Amino acid sequence: MAKKSAVNRNLAVKALVKQYASKRVALKAIANDESLPLEERFEARLKLAKLPRSSSAVRIRNRCEVTGRPRAYYRKLKMSRIALRELGSSGQIPGLVKSSW
């Protein structure tokens, strides 16, 4: 199990990203629009830099829904390889069968 504080921190980052998403998209559009004057684009970049660092989507870490483990994460299943193996072995994931040859 991952530390509760790490899992909660990641949840807080997700909330911040959701809160500032529209503002961030609008500022990025202004900053990247080459038809606008340079000063206006620069102001948009400054405003973007003043937003909280954790409001950027790259700060979100994919974590296992079962254990909170941050590594070896399968996106489709939203869980780590270890949780997948345990749940798969106990037959709790439909359609997952242990391979044998």
From Swiss-Prot:
InterPro entries (alphabetical): Ribosomal_uS14, Ribosomal_uS14_bac/plastid, Ribosomal_uS14_CS
Membrane-spanning segments: none
PROSITE patterns: RIBOSOMAL_S14
Top-level taxon of origin: Bacteria
GO BP annotation list: translation
Molecular function via GO: rRNA binding; structural constituent of ribosome
Keywords: Ribonucleoprotein, Ribosomal protein, RNA-binding, rRNA-binding
GO cellular-component term (any): cytoplasm
Protein role: Binds 16S rRNA, required for the assembly of 30S particles and may also be responsible for determining the conformation of the 16S rRNA at the A site.
Recorded family membership: Belongs to the universal ribosomal protein uS14 family.
Subunit field text: Part of the 30S ribosomal subunit. Contacts proteins S3 and S10.
PANTHER family assigned to the protein according to its UniProt record, in alphabetical order: 30S RIBOSOMAL PROTEIN S14 (PTHR19836), SMALL RIBOSOMAL SUBUNIT PROTEIN US14M (PTHR19836:SF19)
Protein name in the entry: Small ribosomal subunit protein uS14
Gene: rpsN
